[in-house]
């Protein structure tokens, strides 16, 4: 692109000298008017001294002109002679306006280096060859698969960054070839391991044997995301945030994403819709059919819905703790999962809250964890 050259800007003293000539004044005359000696005035006329706000007011009175005129002369001259702006300022500002760059640096996903390398790092992170192909900053499409567009319209920039980190980690994993039949058969075993929090670490291993990669990545601030099903290199992977750090939420999100895998949702698009559990309660959000199907599968997996409905009808409005424990034993699931399902139905989220304790730490033995002061090396 051809560089434009701006016209030179004379120092303000040049105009003052011209004004003196137009009025047939001598420099000593102006010095007298301003109440200063000629040696004090000389640096101003030769551009060696600046027009201060006080001097701009005085010159305005001397020449019967607005003080702003002289102040603007000085401002234009200063701007013209300012040091060239670091081109990295615009580069960093453009990326920061679109993506949580500082958080990405903090998490170790990109390096804090000179701006000239920022474009390259971001293209490499998103797997693009041109900045223009990256959504939110260029014209790249977030939705390569039209059938899923309604859900992708809710995808935010922090969510988009997060799911790419999930994919980058998943690409480093080696698992068995994906087996739909194997995954379906493993559901009962996965559910059995939900009864004891100490057994949760076994679930990622079961998924790996079925050819499904499991990745745990802490959500970025404001991302509002619970999980996603991605297909890097055509092999399924499940990414989760454990945003709510509760067993009922973990079980629900896990089974929800497994259903996406079993159905092949997003396989042609690299990733299925990012999932925010609870978004289905928003009447203004249109959810695709595959999301409703995954919701039903997740709910049935957690607690058989007919049995749950019968239990709630029989015991309402006063469901005792002992009733819940007995029912959870009967359906062979941890009480926290039953309580979570009833809380969702009744909207009473403080009910038996003591059972909703954290589960995230039970998964930290899994190698493929990023966040919570842990960094998974994916290369830059």
Where are these regions (language model features)?
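Active-site hotspot residues in diverse enzymes, especially metal/ion-binding acidic/histidine motifs
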Residues: 2-380
């Amino acid at each position: 692109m051809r560089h434009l050259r701006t016209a030179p800007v004379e120092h303000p003293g040049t105009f003052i000298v011209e004004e003196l000539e137009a009025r047939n004044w001598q420099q000593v005359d102006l010095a007298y008017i301003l109440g200063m000696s000629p040696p004090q005035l000389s640096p101003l006329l030769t551009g060696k001294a600046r027009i201060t706000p006080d001097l701009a007011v005085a010159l305005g009175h001397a020449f019967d002109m607005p003080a702003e005129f002289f102040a603007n002369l000085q401002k234009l001259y200063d701007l013209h002679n300012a040091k060239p702006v670091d081109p990295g300022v615009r580069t960093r500002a453009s990326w920061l306006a679109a993506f949580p760059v500082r958080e990405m640096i903090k998490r170790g996903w990109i390096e804090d280096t000179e701006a000239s390398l920022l474009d390259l790092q971001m293209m490499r992170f998103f797997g693009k060859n041109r900045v223009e192909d990256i959504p939110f900053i260029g014209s790249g499409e977030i939705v390569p698969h039209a059938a899923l567009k309604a859900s992708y319209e809710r995808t935010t920039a922090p969510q988009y960054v997060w799911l790419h980190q999930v994919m980058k980690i998943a690409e480093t994993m080696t698992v068995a070839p994906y087996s739909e039949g194997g995954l379906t058969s493993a559901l009962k075993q996965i559910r059995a391991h939900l009864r004891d929090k100490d057994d949760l670490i076994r679930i990622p291993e079961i998924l790996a044997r079925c050819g499904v990669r499991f990745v745990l990545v802490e959500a970025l601030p404001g991302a509002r995301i619970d999980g996603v099903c991605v297909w890097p290199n055509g092999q399924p992977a499940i990414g989760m945030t454990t945003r709510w750090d509760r067993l009922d939420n973990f079980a629900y999100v896990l089974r929800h994403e497994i259903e996406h895998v079993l159905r092949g949702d997003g396989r042609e698009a690299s990733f299925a819709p990012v999932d925010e559990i609870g978004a289905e309660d928003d009447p203004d959000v249109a959810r695709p059919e595959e999301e409703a199907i995954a919701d039903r599968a997740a709910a049935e997996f957690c607690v058989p819905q007919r049995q749950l409905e019968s239990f709630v009808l029989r015991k309402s409005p006063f469901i005792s703790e002992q009733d819940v424990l007995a029912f959870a034993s009967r359906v062979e699931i941890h009480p926290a999962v039953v309580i979570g399902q009833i809380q969702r139905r009744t909207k009473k989220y403080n009910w038996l809250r003591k059972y909703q304790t954290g589960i995230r730490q039970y998964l930290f033995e899994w190698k493929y964890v990023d966040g919570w002061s842990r960094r998974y090396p994916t290369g830059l």
